[in-house]
């Protein structure tokens, strides 16, 4: 497991009364390359409020370079910001 806490550009869909649903995101790697990752499935969404700051935690997986990758995305409600928080290996 790697904790990244890396900001990502996200394309998401919003429905009335539900948290935003991630569809795909772009991430920039250390070498400067930019990769688009399609969110294949959201397995679970948790609503958490650490220190009074509401956010949603998404447990997802995607097929990346012919491998299944499990990861955790976070959406910070007050900041309207997405983050790739953790990658499970």
Label for each model-derived stretch:
Residues 1-89:
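Cysteine-centric segments in proteins
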């Amino acid at each position: 497991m790697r904790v990244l806490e890396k900001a990502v550009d996200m394309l998401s869909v919003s429905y009335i009364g539900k948290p935003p649903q991630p569809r795909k995101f772009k991430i920039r790697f250390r070498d400067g390359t930019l990769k688009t990752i399609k969110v294949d499935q959201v397995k679970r969404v948790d609503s958490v409020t650490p220190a009074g700051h509401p956010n949603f935690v998404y447990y997802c997986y995607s097929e990346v370079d012919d491998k299944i990758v499990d990861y955790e995305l976070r959406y910070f409600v007050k900041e309207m910001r997405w983050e790739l928080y953790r990658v499970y290996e």
